[in-house]
Amino acid sequence: LNRHTYHAVPGTEAIAPSVPRLCTLRLKGIDRTIVLPDDPELVEALSSCIHGWPSDLQPLDPATLATPDPSALAPLCVIEPRGPGIYRTHSRYLDRPFDKLPAATAICTLLADLSQAYSETPGDHVFGLHCGAVTICGTTLVLAGARRAGKSTLVARLSAFPEVDILCDDVLPIAADGRAVALGLAPRLRLPLPEGASPAFRQHVTRWLGPADDRYGYLPTPNLLSHGKTVPAHVFLLLDRRDEGPARLHGLTEDETLCRLLERSIAGPAGPEPSFAAAHDLAKRLTGLRLVYSDLEEATTLLLRHFGRLGEDRQDFGPVSPPLAPTAPESPETPAEIDQTMPFVRASDAAVRRVGDAAFIWRPGDVMLWHLNPVARAIWAMLDEPAPATLLVEVLGELFPDETPERLASDLQGLMARLCAEGLIHPAG
């Protein structure tokens, strides 16, 4: 990050400032600023996670806080110091701030905002994908899978090899010609590492681990592609992690490739219809493959051998096994019922994240866990304060007089039980 010296107002050196010294960060292509503390450790940690994205860091004049410019756009994100190494973050995409965050989690919320803002801003892309992406000897793989399929861990493991370049582990912009665009944001790794992680993987993480806390850490390895670098996309790789069995590659039908790609699409700056058309065109260009695996090292070795042998000839990605039957969505386990008279409240580390007209329950570092329809969003809003299901049913009964109380109570019971099982709400007190 390009850093400029903070210039204090002459004659005020002995006066304790009413607010901490702050900076504004601007990144090329993003029309809103980021406000953060003038804290060298935080700035250095953030800088280590952003590779090649032109930026400008300037001191924020305290006078502008008292008399803000009414014509200026509100900041994209504000990181507020709350004590040594602790921060509160405010985002234009979230319905509430996150408080008491360590530096790595505060950086996580900021990078999520940057990814979303870039996806919405007109530029060199038409839509985005929630996915990981790497190149192996010049072949670009778009990696996606169900939650807990091991995407981020696989990207991190592959980052240890010199024949691999890293594009992303979360959001991948796609240009009109189908090329993948690197954002230059370091991949994030779930911590602690799995018990079965190999010594080589542990050594790699120890060497390159950047900002980290007890849940996640960033891995700014030298093979992270710079912001704006584009490469052709070749393969859509669906991750299918299982409890046992050897690593193997299967073909993926065109229909399932398209379906899985659309599931992970993020509407671009022109809106959903052009994004859908571009995603459809991309699916036609990509070869769809399924990676079935249970062991991370086996999967890594298989990918390196399979794609490393291709060289410049990428017309044939075989031999692979025949396609499997399309994977049915996993049926979630029925959660235990909750006491409908017990007050519940939202978890402090969860908030509503807005993406266009849609809303999701989101946690820093996690995927967007829950899509909220209007009714669920109203329930989530009411749980900002402790409330039992019995009270919520009464309110819903006024909003939906045609529904029976029994039906409303049953639906609400199921929703709150699932939210509780995920740790998104908990008993108050």
Locations of the language-model features?
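Long, basic/Gly/Ser/Thr-rich N-terminal segments
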Residues: 1-110, 114-117, 301, 305-317, ...
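Long, charge-rich, low-complexity alpha-helical segments
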Residues: 2-5, 314, 365-429
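Glycine-rich, often acidic-flanked micro-motifs
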Residues: 3-23, 38-46, 130-132, 136-146, ...
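A structural signal for short hydrophobic beta-strand segments in well-ordered beta-sheet cores
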Residues: 79, 133-134, 171-174, 352, ...
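P-loop NTPase catalytic core of nucleic-acid-dependent motor ATPases
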Residues: 108-144
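Conserved lysine of the Walker
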Residues: 151
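Post-Walker A alpha-helix
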Residues: 154-155
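Low-complexity, glycine/alanine/valine/leucine- and proline-rich hydrophobic stretches
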Residues: 252-269, 353-357, 363-381
